[in-house]
Amino acid sequence: MFPALAQLFESVFDLFFPARCLHCNRGIASPKAVLCLYCEINLPLTYSHLMHPSPLKKYLFPALPLERVFALYVFEEGALIESLLYQFKYDGNKAIGVFFGRRLAGLIHHSKQAYDGIIGVPLHPKRKRKRGFNQVDVIGQTTAMLLSIPYFGEILQRVKHTPKLSQSKRDRGEILHNAFRLNPRVILPKGHYLLIDDILTTGATLSACSKVILEIAKVSLSIGTIVYRN
């Protein structure tokens, strides 16, 4: 009864207060969509999940035995994708994170990839307190729920607070040395996991996390991000 009432209330609410596209303000069928169809189809897809080997592997440390590396979208400065990321991370619009998670789950499902779980890149506690949430958790929890697999948001711990500066891959790698460790209270069963982050830039953060995860016996790893920035 209660789910039916909730659905009825949502339908009435949508009738009087229709959802609007975050970008162009056109009406959209559901608030979960975030964008109208026109704006969504103009998001720049990478199609990197279809490429073997992935061209994005070159951004990760070459010694890492990664299965797949892919990103949903290409970052474009001043464009819609940058605006979405900013509103999500810094304005706290978690609906955008849910949207990203739904699109990531759809890509994984349609490309017939199979994972035993999803792992999120952690924030340092200081940065998480300042922001109020870890944006990767929103994406990861949504994706995992839709794929009916577990989300491991606490398997990694960030123990070194690093400055948010634009550096070379080598410099970032040195700064991030020993920045992550495994949480001794969380057990990761053997299997193939997807490590996710919101954006791939130099690859140093994802490489540092991957190195720690791959120290676990009988674990294989792929990497997926929402955006790739050249």
Annotate each PLM feature.
Residues 1-197, 201-230:
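Glycine-rich phosphate/pyrophosphate-handling loop used in enzymes and phosphotransfer proteins
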